[in-house]
Amino acid sequence: MTFILRVRQICTKIHKLLNYSAIILLGLPQNFFMLDLIEFLEPVPLHELNDDKGYTDGQLAKHIKIYEEELPDLENIDIVLLGITETRGNGYFEAENNAANIIRKHLYQLHYWHNDIQIADFGNVKKGATIKDSYAGIKTVLAELIRHKKTVILFGGSHDITLAQYEAYIELNQQIEATGIDAMIDLRGDSPIRSHNFLMDMLTNEPSMVKHYNHIAFQSYFVHPRMLETMDKLRFDCYRVGTVTENIEEMEPVLRNSHLLSFDISAIKYSDAPANKNCPNGLTGVEACILTRYAGLSNLLSSFGIYGYRPQDDVEELTAKQISQMIWYFIDGKNRCKKETDLKESHNFNEYHTAFTEVDTVFLQSKKTNRWWMQMPDKSFIACSHGDYIKASNNEIPERWLRVQERN
């Protein structure tokens, strides 16, 4: 593993000397610097997923470039699937974990509706000798894929894998807005379980690449009030599950602004995700799919992880089916996102001028997707909702506007 990481460091230095545009001009394949990644990956056992029964032409498996013997070429690929097998961070020792392949089995059976979206499956990231080795492997693979402008969906593994997901952006020296969807806020410093406290490192360690953090669907009885006070002092935004379910469309701008999304299945109630034994309440399966579709609509989001699935706790693999459908809806959102145009193309937007408390501002509404943007005092535009426009029209300060101003 150390040798491979050294090779990776050398490739990174080459990247700085020979940028991506130069690679294209020289006619090199997009995965020219990705030859070492195969050392971190396990191929997809396709014959095991379908019992050698094959797939019909309409199913996803027929339209995905799958790593069976050779890594797929990244040319024209929009989304890369990446299975995670590392689960030691959840406090359980599991010699083998097949969560990713069970999710993959059900995903492959779904029907393909999105001809404009090209997908590759890079298999599973190998588990390292230690949990830190696993983090390093995930970080390395993810950083390389993001560097090549790919959107990566990670699935399987414990929720602390979010930290490795985040470390990919540190390697890329990219500041991000991160969003977590979880019934709990994993800042429990008194817990020895990594998946309970990883946010502490992510939000406080240096160098920090998190310019803002959102937490969606927390359940109040799982969160100490002082923890919320701390999050608020840091100007991070936290949304109770009740707030989310009452007005779920308000979460779309939150996810549209995000670069990293981490979804713990503990946010979904037990009846819709029976592998989540600790939460009788929470999001419904439909609401989870709506949120992941919103995430797919973001043209900023480059990594999306779904964590916390333990097959041994599942019933009839219903949770795996739920996760596979959440991934399907993310792809659906990405397909819709491709139809959005740049804000500079003013003819594709309705423009509304308004003022609140003596502040003049502009709202833009997309003619293609009906999404909204709001102009800030520095003339930049941020994602917002129709509700923000209604408040501004009534001479009220939209809370989203105020929170962004506080952070600037």
Mark where each language-model region is:
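Basic polycationic patches enriched in arginine
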Residues: 6-8
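Short, Lys/Arg-enriched N-terminal segments with co-localized hydrophobic residues
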Residues: 17-33
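Conserved alpha-helical scaffold segments that buttress catalytic/binding sites
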Residues: 35-81, 88-408
